[in-house]
A protein has these predicted regions:
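Short helix-to-loop capping/linker segments positioned immediately adjacent to catalytic or ligand/cofactor-binding
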Residues: 14, 90-94, 110-114
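Acidic, metal-coordinating catalytic segment for phosphate/diphosphate chemistry
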Residues: 2-38, 42-46
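A short coil-to-beta-strand element that immediately follows conserved catalytic motifs
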Residues: 94-104
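Short, catalytically relevant binding-site loops at active-site mouths
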Residues: 56-58, 105-108
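Conserved Nudix-box catalytic region and its N-terminal flanking loop in Nudix hydrolases
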Residues: 23-36, 45-85, 89
């Protein structure tokens, strides 16, 4: 987590309040609600989901498996642009297509992890990639492409090895018609 990065504080409906704060200082017990995003990247050729293992050096949730990419839009940055920026930085994916918001009002707060707490208004997106990832080792330990059913099995079989938000989003995505339609 970089202290130089800024997060955008939002109200209960996800509207920016006009305030921003340093990313690291904005993930404590006094964390204000701020804007994030979560993205599930599907491989265009076979519709498999890109699942990533967070780098062991990460301050938050190191070594756990999660969805494809997450992050925070910078002040004034469109979420789709932030998704592309983080996918390029974390995964080496220069091109993402058809970015769609499937859970526009998703919000979560994590239990403390070494003093760090997530309190995010975090819309969930789906995007498509045609290229193979080239992960940044500072961000991603490993990755794999899985059918949605195998991802569901992984969440059930290894819940302690999965990110908090991945486990929290799964039941919502299963009931989300736009997402389910993409998985067919």
């Amino acid at each position: 987590m970089s202290e130089a990065e800024q997060v955008v504080f939002v109200d209960e409906h996800g509207n920016p309040t006009g305030e921003v704060g340093p990313k690291l200082a904005s993930h404590t017990a006094a964390t204000k609600l701020h804007l994030g995003f979560s993205c599930y990247i599907l491989r265009r050729s076979d519709n498999k989901l890109l699942v990533t293992e967070r780098a062991l050096s990460k301050k938050v949730w190191p070594g756990v498996w999660t969805n494809s990419v997450c992050g925070h839009p910078a002040p004034g940055e469109k979420v789709a642009d932030a998704i592309r920026r983080r996918a390029a930085y974390e995964l080496g994916l220069a091109q993402l297509d058809d970015i769609q918001c499937v859970l526009p009002t998703y919000r979560y707060t994590t239990p403390p992890y070494h003093g760090i707490i997530e309190n995010e208004f975090c819309p969930v997106y789906v995007a498509y990639a045609s290229d193979e990832p080239r992960p940044n080792p500072e961000e991603v330990e490993a990755y794999k492409w899985l059918p949605w059913s195998a991802y569901a099995d992984m969440l059930r079989a290894e819940p302690d090895n999965m990110s908090y938000w991945a486990k929290d989003q799964y039941p919502l995505l299963r009931l989300c018609e736009p997402f389910v339609a993409l998985m067919d």
